[in-house]
Amino acid sequence: PIGTDWSRLFEAGYVQEPEVRIRYLPWGDDVAQNEWAHAEGRDRHRVAAENPEKVAETRRLLDAHPDASALVFVDWLDQGEALAEALDVPFVSGEMPHHRRDRVFESFRAGDLDTVVVSRVGDEGIDLPNAEVAIVASGLGGSRRQGAQRAGRTMRPAGGSRVYVLATRGTSEEEFAQRQMRHLAEKGIRVIESNVDDGAGSGDDVE
């Protein structure tokens, strides 16, 4: 439950503690960075969220966990569609008919699908399946409750689990990520921050 002191559940052995890693990314190209520099308000948040480097980093993280089930969370439809196309996986959004959404999640639970990209609809009362890996590719401006829900998707009775939070370096995403992760740390979840170097792959061990 969101209001629960998760550290007590971990100590009692009821759930496996997830590990949360915030990964600060460089811009994927100068075009996106220039667009962000000239954007304002909501558009600025969108451009930071849609940083092309997040596609490459998501691929690297999924490659590092080849046998794990993974949910990739986004707040922007264009970003979700681009990620789903790049990864060749389904994108579940509020625009998807309920019967199709149910089929996707049934396939995910059955192990026929390893990865699903999910829009904010996944945080709004939908019975999402649990996953071994969660990648938060955008949505860093959301509430602390939303951040807690997304981390909670990887809480399992046994086995390891990981949450990766992708934030574009030098933008408001850094502040949002740190704010949400402080909230998770207060609940007993271990949080690790790392910088992904320009052109240097994932920057640290993601195993």
Ranges and model annotations:
Residues L71-F73, D78-A82, D88-D123:
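Conserved helicase ATPase core of P-loop NTP-dependent helicases/translocases
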Residues V15-E19, P129-V133, P157-V163, K187-I189:
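Short glycine-/polar-rich loops that comprise or flank the Walker A/P-loop
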Residues A64, S69-A70, V191-E207:
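Long, largely alpha-helical accessory region at the distal end of helicase-like NTP-driven motors
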Residues G125-L128, G142-A148, T171-Q178:
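Switch/connector loops and helix/strand junctions flanking conserved nucleotide-binding motifs
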Residues R153-H183:
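Conserved segment of the helicase C-terminal RecA-like domain
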Residues T115-V117, E124-G139, S161-L166:
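A short beta-strand element within the Helicase C-terminal
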Residues A32-E85:
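Conserved interdomain hinge at the start of the Helicase C-terminal
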Residues P1-V20:
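Post-DEXD/H (motif II) to motif III coupling segment of the RecA-like Helicase ATP-binding lobe
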